[in-house]
Amino acid sequence: MVNNINQLGIEEILELLPHRYPFLLLDRVTDYTLGESITAYKNITFNEPCFTGHFPGKPIFPGVLILEALAQAAGVLGFKTAGNSDDLYLYAGIDKARFKHPVVPGDRLDMDVRLIKERRGIWKFHGVGSVDGKAVCEAEFMCAMRKL
């Protein structure tokens, strides 16, 4: 458990998200402002299951998993903002996705996600993934809030 009021450790993340190994892609939330933004990270290790086939001898963390990590951070922000754990956040669309640099074992993938707008259960976000302060992925995406 993390003591800072605007941080969440893995225990709190597990209480909010339905994802579990090997698909939980957040290690810690470092800051959030309800209804506005969230920052989080995932440590990328050689033990990630995706590296078995992506790519043997040259492991690169898949771009689609970076997008999923951004969406999971957005989901935490949504759950914390809306306060309803009976809902599920589902991807509804991805726009303007760009992959700028590869992410490899040993990197810390930092995520910065900002809420653009929310209307009728559709949340639109802008997310940036970075490593060592350098953007590796950027996208706008939408999540739909639905009952389980």
UniProtKB/Swiss-Prot annotation:
NCBIfam families in alphabetical order: fabZ, PRK00006.1
Main localization, broad class: cytoplasm
Species annotation: Pseudoalteromonas atlantica (strain T6c / ATCC BAA-1087)
Entry annotation: catalytic residues: 54
Role this protein plays: Involved in unsaturated fatty acids biosynthesis. Catalyzes the dehydration of short chain beta-hydroxyacyl-ACPs and long chain saturated and unsaturated beta-hydroxyacyl-ACPs.
EC number: 4.2.1.59
InterPro entries, A to Z: FabA_FabZ, FabZ, HotDog_dom_sf
Catalysis performed (reactions): a (3R)-hydroxyacyl-[ACP] = a (2E)-enoyl-[ACP] + H2O
A matching Pfam family: FabA
Location of this chain's protein in the cell: Cytoplasm
Keyword presence, Lipid biosynthesis: yes
Protein name in UniProt: 3-hydroxyacyl-[acyl-carrier-protein] dehydratase FabZ
